[in-house]
Amino acid sequence: LGLRACDGNVDHAAVHIANRREELDQIKKEEREKKKRRLENINHLKGMGYSMRAARQALHQAAGNLEEALKILLHNPQLWWLNDSAPESNNRQQSPSQEKIDQLVYMGFDAVAAKAALRVFRDNVQLAAQTLVHNGGRLPPDLQLSAEDSSSTPSTSPSDSAGTSSASTDEDMETEAVNEILEDIPEHEEDYLDSTLEDEEIIIAEYLSYVENIKSAAKKN
């Protein structure tokens, strides 16, 4: 490639190759730093009470910008339902503990709103409080409906609801898996030249394993 780029001139090709290696090394260094920042941002959001899936999705939509990801999470509370191991529909059916309801009431929130928020956010006081503060002490309309649905008896059987949602759930899981794997693949146009067949096999195996693990977790629940 170096000789081709330099019309067969060996000396120029050697300089060209050395320069390209320096450029690629710099690009790889920047990509490592980018991945490190992304992991730090994910951990920062997890420390605020968000699940890893919610943090990753928000950061993906915000192109890695932490402040924008926080805005996305605040304005799209449905993302907070994303759980790392189980479908959110099962988790939202749990009744909140009285102790955590009392904590929110002590902060000044209405008991009914506190209970509804805790039901939606699986007893997570921090997320429930953030939602209530952001919406003037109440749940937004879409979350109010979700809280009511989770506390009432469904009119359809579990098998019926599972049948109608399984296809879209599988598609969402596969899309998320693809996005996760793609974010770990170097972005530079010539990086594939440094990849071996073993590297490609590892990436494919990781993708297939990721999809299989998510599907297995969904089936268990």
Swiss-Prot record:
It is found in: Nucleus. Transmembrane segments: none annotated. Residues 136-193 are annotated as: Disordered. It comes from the Eukaryota. Residues 169-193 have a biased composition (Acidic residues). Residues 1-19, 30-76, 95-135 form the UBA domain. PANTHER family: NEDD8 ULTIMATE BUSTER 1 (PTHR12948:SF3), NEDD8 ULTIMATE BUSTER-1 BS4 PROTEIN (PTHR12948). This is NEDD8 ultimate buster 1. It comes from Bos taurus. The lineage of its organism: Eukaryota, Metazoa, Chordata, Craniata, Vertebrata.
